[in-house]
Amino acid sequence: METNKQDLFKKLLRQINWENKHGFEEVFTNAEIQKVEVHVESKVWNFHLQIEDILPYEVFYQFYQQLQLAFKDIAKVDITLHTKNPIITNQKLGDYWKWVVFNSGIQSSFIQELSRSKVPYLDNNRVILLAENEIVKRFLVDQALGPLESTYHKIGFPKFSVNTLVDETKAQEIIENIKEQKAKSDAELAQKAVEAIKKQSEQREKSKAEVPSIEGPVQLGKKISPDQEITQMINITEEERSVTVQGYVFDKEVRELRSGRKLLILEVTDYTASFVVKKFSRTEEDEAMFDAINSGVWIKVRGSVQEDNYMRDLVINAYDLNEIKHESRKDTAPENEKRVELHLHSNMSMMDATNSITEYVSKAAEWGHKAIAITDHGTLQAFPEAHAAGQKNNVKILYGVEANIVDDGVPIAYNEQHKNLRDATYVIFDTETTGLSAQYDKVIELAAVKMEKGNVIDTFEEFIDPGHPLSQTTINLTSITDDMVRGSKSEEEVFRLFKEFCKDCIIVGHNATFDVDFMNTGYERHNMEMIQEPWIDTLPLARYLYPEMKGFRLNTLAKKLNIKLEHHHRAIYDAEATGFIYYAMLKDAEEKQILYHDDFNKHVGENDAYKHEHPSHAIILAKTQEGLKNLFKLTSESMVKYFYRVPRVPRSILEKYREGLIVGSACADGEVFTAMMQKGYTIAKQKAEFYDYLEVQPKPLYEPLLEQELVKDNDNLEEIITNMVKLAHELDKPIVATGDVHFMNKEDAIYRKILIHSQAGANPLNRLKKLPDAHFRTTDEMLEEFSFLGEDIAKEIVVTNPNKLVDEISEITPVKDKLYTPKMEGAEQDIHDLTMNRAHAWYGDTLPEIVQKRLDKELKSVIGNGFSVIYLISQKLVYKSNKDGYLVGSRGSVGSSLVATMTGITEVNPLPPHYRCPKCKWTHFYEKGEYGSGYDLPDKDCPNCGTELIKDGQDIPFETFLGFKGNKVPDIDLNFSGDYQPIAHNYTKVLFGENNVYRAGTIGTVADKTAYGYVKAYERDTEQNFRGAEIDRLAKGATGVKRTTGQHPAGILVVPDYMDIYDFTPIQYPADDLTAAWRTTHFDFHSIHDNILKLDILGHDDPTMIRMLQDLSGIDPKTIPTDDPGVMALFSGTDILGVTPEEIQSSTGTLGVPEFGTRFVRGMLEETHPKTFAELLKISGLSHGTDVWLGNAEELIKNGTVTMPDVIGCRDDIMMDLIHMGVESDKAFKIMEHVRKGRGIPDEWQADMRAADVPEWYIGACLKIKYMFPKAHAAAYVLMALRIAYFKVYYPLVYYAAYFSVRADDFDLVSMSRGKEAVKNAMELINSKGNEATTKEKNLLTVLEIANEMLERGFDFSMVDINKSDAQNWTIQEDGRTLLAPFTAIPGLGLNVAKQIVAAREEQEFISKEDLSKRGKVSQSLIDFMTENHVLDDLPDENQLSLF
């Protein structure tokens, strides 16, 4: 009997037009629909069907396709098949295999490819899948089998487990194949390399030729109709079958899949939201289209919206993708009637503006603007970039700053009279007002107390009816209601009464300038005389008397002076409290000999008054080159002398440096606009006299004033702007309309919003509901903004006046066009003499020709190009360090210079490998590449006198240092001991004077991860939910903005004594830290690198460690041999240490040896087994280069093409190898320069190399290289490493004491003191975390590896000893087998506390834990640690009093 479920199934077959399919009836006999799961949100219907047996694959596939097709307009369809009597066969397993792999949900294309290349089979009822080897098996087990098994079951197969076995036959074939490959001759391999390179070259050319030329806009798929409805991205919230969007591409990636296809991934925004758009390639033309699409274009996309399992986000899978033309804003004003922006902020305005000056200048050029100003907040750091952008775009740059102007000190007393303060009668008054503007707001309460001798003798208190309802803000602030003022006396009547009340008195108020402004405005309004009585403002008086206070509000002062203050913000109570506060202050003023009213202002400006004034903004533009230098000086003083929260410019400093500058009145925070808004036309006119031009801005930029009720409404705002124009005309000063630009386009406002949000309460803009619209406006947009002024006035302020101002300003250059080096008298002769003296001392009175020629060539370059002083400075620094007992290591290519060697700057000798006799000066040079390093020459006695010969020379060309012509500015980097670095830095002040040396300044900008954090915080705090692509977009918009400043860790810039620093840059303190020891350049040092000499005086651990090793052992490190066989044995095994590789978990003994201790380099050592200094040089070069070892030299060695001595290791190898092979030296140099910078080798140069029989493998290796290490740098590092390794081999405890004291920061003291098992357990714990281990844990693991090695060598660690331990150094104990831990090894115990413990112990032994805590400044948690680990067993808890 047919069931209802069977009937439903037959209905389904009819619905999908399947019931008459011939030959398929049998397999669906008794088939049922068990249930249908409907997923509403994802629009997926899952049919659960029950059938007898597994369907034949072709039936299943056709049925599945027909089902999906039938429901395509309703939902996506999935099926789950339940079988009653399933029978598995090899046929069925194989037929379904590809479908199962594809639909298993396996994300990894590599795993999919692995799976597709195999087919499972049945063996004794087990399903078997073969793998070539254990690695492939592991991949399949971990990542593929589970999804594959589930997918089989879903389509009707019974549950089974796939068993993965290694295909022994296949594995053996692979092994035999490898052996066969190994057995091939070098000639065959070389020929293969030739063919590969040739094929690669042909393929490149072929691909260039075959790739279709993309002309015009990119189109992938079909053309999308212009009439197609566009969906805004913000409205896409769930999966959709078809949607069309358009937007701006802001990021692009093309991934190559293992299948050979390519995947295009775009991040696109329409500025309502952002989406990832994906498209797979189908043809080579598609791939060419992928390459043609770039970030920065607009596209229209039609596709489906789906949840991407990998991204865990909705993405758009594109069917059709069309590049479209997007009309950006244009400036359509006539050519000679374009505006110029005179107020603009770049991303160097700290955390406040988003675009680079380069972007603005480019846009100005696009719009046809002839000039643009850069006026960042208090900084000039965009000047160098602006200069370059201006030159590139042919746009004139106006160099300026928006400065924070402060008065040098405001008066305390006004209308001064010689009146005795103690005998005077005072009126202390306060007002309550409807707002902050004396011009537009009204007094609603006026109250005062009259006082004599500190006593109240009369009071005055009146409400005033303002004639309109009070705002809620006013009511909340003043506690005055409409009922209280309604029907009160008029303003005129109250003001007349108050004027009478004040006769013959001194008037006093707190922040009285505010109240006096309101009073005088009211008096003026009613034709009464303004205040003539002497008056005092207690706010600046308090700042003078109590500079230590941080705030000077009335309630703060009342608390300090013990004055009771009730009902604050009610006028009568505030007035009375101010009176008592004033009398208390008067006593303190008398102690400073302030006895009369006219004594107060003698003290104006004292006690850092500039800190207490509220800064007002002003635009300062450099008019001339002299003005630019004055701007540098003025900015420097604001940063170095007058920095307080922001860099401040006292008015007197601006006057001092005003020559060549133009000063404008700036924005709403400028004093002229503020005065017009709050104090009225007359006061504004007085303020405006100071400025060269006035400034107004579009109304949207003043919206915060409306929000804060500082301006009542739009009419008030237009009146203020109109009055600003009127004022400028009256004073005959130009007035200009500016944009106060902070970002490029309106839609970019969100980036600034995110930056400001990140600063929380520190930025007052966060109190605004909406930030002002401060985008870069076109001429048309600006004219429209000021249309309310009338067409003529709008054009005057938008176009005419700004252009006139531009024409008044000279062409200015903020950066120099050449290098200015310091001069040291006699430097040339000193360098010559130092060089020749050592050369003769080493090589004899008559120098060998090779030495003489090299020195002649170098001295001509060094002296002839004015580089002597650079060499001499370095020589003096190194000489002083050596004299003080610290070796100096050289970095970079300075070791390529024989003059540097002869003057003692570097130990590296760049001559070819050679012998020299220290006694009779006999020499012998190997000039044909027979040896890679002189240190590898066999030991030999002098054939003339029998003295043991010195072996030297690294065969490094001079050209790698100063270029082929010898005119490249030398960059001498020196590695001083980290302990000695500050001394070396300060020695430059001795050499050149404090005002001629500065630390190289740096600019810290918002990094990608930081920006991402800002966006996530903004998303959280504003309760929004951004897609991943939108987060990426917003983070990109916030990236690159100046966040702080700093200093280069080593760079010292030297100003020549015939110039001053302001010829190059302003100066400041790093991160505005006024306590810093050094001042830095204001400009990032990279921008002036080619103009001023930079010394790189680095701090490094190796010289510090060498010094400690020398101190502990008494051995001079310079006497250590460079070819000691025991030391060399470290690099190929562990026997020399007396341990096995298993014990120390390393196949070499180089743990803790600089340059050779990392896992990566140890792996290289295991593969290469270096035995010579030259090979160690190669290893150093290979490990620091990019694409020099991995995929290059490593493969050449593995396949037997070359051996270790032949590979390219350092950049200099290329030049010297090619010269030895017969390539001309200049061509060899050019090839080396191209290769080391990753530029490849041009075809014609390759032809020259082949003509000189350069092997093809060598050319191929060069073509892969992206970056190479200088050989001189490698030589200096390896030399230092060998010296340290020597102590590790022969003076182990000395080595370990130095290592743990100098190089280690993180310790597991408990494990180390308990022995090797505990250390091994700690290592295993960290290793088990894999990539989840923290950076601190990874650093600790390195330390534990060294600790384990030391323990395995038979030495021990001892826990801290309260009576013996050093503050920071590990010390060797009397038994010669134990290292005692210092106090800093205790977790959480810093160096300062460690030193305090030792200092206190030296004064007197600790008698208790309480004593240790008090005198040693040791916290309870540290006491607990020491107690738990038996450090304090001999100390009682508390001090005890003894009677005996």
UniProtKB/Swiss-Prot annotation:
Location within or outside the cell: Cytoplasm
GO biological process: DNA-templated DNA replication
Group of enzyme by EC: transferase
Top-level taxon of origin: Bacteria
Keyword Ribonucleoprotein appears in the UniProt entry: no
Coiled coil: none
Domain Exonuclease, residue spans: 426-582
Pfam families: DNA_pol3_a_NI, DNA_pol3_a_NII, DNA_pol3_alpha, DNA_pol3_finger, HHH_6, PHP, RNase_T, tRNA_anti-codon
Cited InterPro entries: DNA_pol3_alpha_NTPase_dom, DNA_pol3_finger, DNA_PolC-like_N_II, DNA_PolC-type_N_I, DnaE2/DnaE/PolC, DNAPol_HHH, DnaQ, Exonuclease_RNaseT/DNA_pol3
Substrates-to-products reaction catalysed: DNA(n) + a 2'-deoxyribonucleoside 5'-triphosphate = DNA(n+1) + diphosphate
Keyword list, A-Z: Cytoplasm, DNA replication, DNA-directed DNA polymerase, Exonuclease, Hydrolase, Nuclease, Nucleotidyltransferase, Transferase
EC number: 2.7.7.7
Gene Ontology MF annotations: 3'-5' exonuclease activity; DNA binding; DNA-directed DNA polymerase activity
Entry function: Required for replicative DNA synthesis. This DNA polymerase also exhibits 3' to 5' exonuclease activity.
Family statement drawn from the similarity comment of this UniProt entry: Belongs to the DNA polymerase type-C family. PolC subfamily.
Name of the featured protein: DNA polymerase III PolC-type
Taxonomic source organism: Ligilactobacillus salivarius (strain UCC118) (Lactobacillus salivarius)
